[in-house]
Amino acid sequence: ALFIAYRRKNQRYRQIVRQQHELIQKEKTIKELYSQSEGGRKYTVSSLSDEKGQALFSEFEKLMRTEKIYRRSDITVDKIADRLETNRTYLSRAINENSGMSFSQYINSCRIDEARHILSETDNDIQIKALAYELGFATPETFSATFKRSIGMLPTKFRKEMRRMYNDARETN
């Protein structure tokens, strides 16, 4: 019975890893399409926010993508608001209305997305502790807990399963 439970757990881990791998591939496709489009997305007025809020969120997203400031451990909504020449309340509202997340949730989602990509690279042997600090987490424990909450498994297990999946794919080809 214990062996069967262990096998089921491993099968679920593999399923999660496959889903994450598919998401990474879809993200790459979307990024390619976005970079090929004329200026990215167009602004429209939505029921959730106005054009100014969407424009502010777009600037915020651009800052995240181009400068990867989410990697800074001392990042705050106040610092970003100053950088974007707005106030913290308006920035927080723009983030919440356009992403459905709070500032800290958005920052952590950027960090976890990058961690997912790095840990998916089979030739990357960065230590989890070093990765946690590189991505702006205060401690490796916070990183691991956030990663597990988001992805469903610890970063070490995710890396191991990604490598296993990669090796299985190579063996079948």
Model-identified regions with their sequence ranges:
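Selective detector of the "anchor" transmembrane alpha-helix that sits immediately C-terminal
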Residues: A1-R7
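Membrane-proximal linker segments that couple transmembrane helices to downstream signaling/catalytic modules
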Residues: R8-S109, D113-T122, T146, T156, ...
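Sequence-specific DNA-binding recognition helix
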Residues: T122-F158
